[in-house]
Each structure stands twice: as C-alpha cells, then as structure tokens.
Amino acid sequence: METFLFTSESVNEGHPDKLCDQVSDAILDACLEQDPESKVACETCTKTNMVMVFGEITTKATVDYEKIVRDTCRGIGFTSADVGLDADHCKVLVNIEQQSPDIAQGVHGHLTKKPEEIGAGDQGHMFGYATDETPELMPLTHVWATKLGAKLTEVRKNKTCPWLRPDGKTQVTVEYRNDNGAMIPLRVHTILISTQHDETVTNDQIAQDLKEHVIKPVVPAEYLDENTIFHLNPSGRFVIGGPHGDAGLTGRKIIIDTYGGWGAHGGGAFSGKDPTKVDRSGAYIVRQAAKSVVASGLARRCIVQVSYAIGVAEPLSVFVDTYKTGTIPDKDILTLIKENFDFRPGMMSINLDLLRGGNFRYQKTAAYGHFGRDDPDFTWETVKVLNPQA
C-alpha cells in the first residue's frame, strides 16, 4: 500500500502574529458593532513593549483603539514583561486614517449602491476547501494541530499546567493513503509542540504534562503507535516569548487560518478587514460552497476558487475541482454552486450576516482557524444541501 506524509502547523493565541490578528479583529468588531457599514482595513504590529495599530478606517463608531489593544493583550495573558508583554504598561501607537475616496467611490459609491451592486473592495482570488476525512470536513492534520494549540491555551488559563506562558506552536504529521482522490488518515507520524514556559519547570515535566494534558485529550490513542515521534520543546528552552521573542504582524498566518497547507490559497489575509474586502468574504463563501458539496455527498473532497476585480460586483470566474471524487461531473457541480451561492460582495455580507460585529464575533476567528468551527457566529460553516437535477 502506497502512503505519504503530510504536515500542518498551528500557533496559539499568544504567538505575536496571532496577537496582531486578534487586535485587528477586535477593532473590526468594535467598529461593526456600532456601525455595520464601517470600512475597516486595520493592521497591527508588535515588538518588545509596543503595539501599533495602523491602516484605514471609515466609521461612525466611537472607538477607543488603545483600550481595545490593552484589553485584547490582557485577555490573551500578556500581563507582565516577563511573559512577553505587559498589556497595561506597554506603548500603544495609533496611526489610522480614512479609506481612500478613490477606493470608496469605486466600491460602494459612497453608500448609494444597492447591496447587489456593491463592487469588490479589491482584485484577487480566493479558495475554499473541504474533505470528508473529519466530521468538520477539514483536513485532519490541520484540525489536530489547531486543537493542540487551543488545548495548550486551555490548560494554561485553567492552571492545569501553571508553568505555561502564552506563546506556543504545534505541528502534526500524519501518514495518509490516497483512495482515488480521497484522503484516508492512517496514523500519526510526528507530533511537535514548542511552548513558552516559566523559569521553574524542567524539560521532563514539560514533556510529561504535554503528553498527559494536551496530546492525550486531542489525538485519539488509536492513531498513535510505538513509532510515533514526539518532539516536545525540542529546542530545550523557550522562556522568552510573545512580542519580546519575535516581532508580530497581522496577516502572517494565512495557512494556519485556513486549511493547513491543503487545498490552495490566494494570498489574502483575513483579520482586520470588513466584509467588502473579498479576501475575507470571498474565502468564507467558497468554504461554504466546498463544504456543502462534500456534505451533500456530491464529492469526498472539493476545492472552489472565485476571483474578483475592484469595483465589480459579479465574480470574474468560479472554478471547482473534486479531485476525481465527484459523484456527478464537476461541470454539473459548478452549475449547482452558481445556482445556490451568490458571490457578489454585498449579497455575501447579507447572506452570511457578515456586517454583524461585536461580542468577539470576528476576534474569535483570529485564533484557532476560521473554518471547521462549531459556533453559530461562523455562518459560513452552515451547509446548504445541494440536490442535482434528475
């Protein structure tokens, strides 16, 4: 039997790039909560003792950017300089301007256009992917890497492992078999966890706790065998972390945000962008389309691409590939997708309820993946049943 290895990684919410994603989306939430028509393109960067937010925001909302930055960092666990950042005493820099009027008139005609006429905020192409290898219809390597990262945070915050600090990374390698285009996971080849820790804990304690409290609850025992390799803090020491260890920037973790290297990616990041930015809304609706194809039993694996021109409402192209796993021809699946999904930006915002912010709606997406999440706020995970015409 011919097999292959595939690897996906994740980082948890204390990673500096992910801190930036969460700050950008917390600001988006605050703007949309008060003004659903807000136009937001918010970037964040961070390094030792400093967080800066910058970009273009046009909104009627009253937003305290500095408070959002500090609250977000504090919520992650950055409460003192020795863990990587002190939320209450770090420098917060804000350099935010209004959206360019050239972009504004081309995209939304200064809010005079009907929803179906609103043009895409930029050019670009986005991909959605789904696979039947997990209940979430997501790649297993990505699901486990992501869940290991989330579990690391959980056992840090509930004090199961009090020696943990906020920053951390995970990586999972799985041995697969290709079943005529469908992916069949066989076993875990390697699990890698690198987590920030305090000065007191030993490497033996780290390895023991990670196996017992992080890996065991996430990865089913039947996928682990005597040949599974564990690299648990292989560098030996990871005390300095967060923005103190590495600079962070919004939009640096786009594969972790999506499918862990499976499928494809058009290159556009998500966080800090309102729904007129098709980098985000376009990627969300093609995930819904691909997931619906697989959930409806039309294919075991599916990728969907959509592309846009700035200021133009209708997509330039829609593409589908089922990797030869389709129960009907791909061209018929494409017809079904076009009949059931409206790819115009204004309509995506309405149909997926993307103008609703606040209550951590977008901030939640900014750590542990935008897809495969069981949460009603992740409206793009709702399956539409697709019935081919007899």
Swiss-Prot record:
Tell me the SUPFAM superfamilies matching this sequence: S-adenosylmethionine synthetase (SSF55973)
Q: Name one Pfam family in it.
A: S-AdoMet_synt_C
Q: Name one GO molecular function term.
A: ATP binding
Instruction: Name one process (GO BP) from the record.
Output: S-adenosylmethionine biosynthetic process
Binding locations of K(+):
E43
Task: Kindly give the NCBIfam families that the UniProt entry links to this protein.
Answer: metK
Protein family membership: Belongs to the AdoMet synthase family.
This chain belongs to the protein called S-adenosylmethionine synthase 1
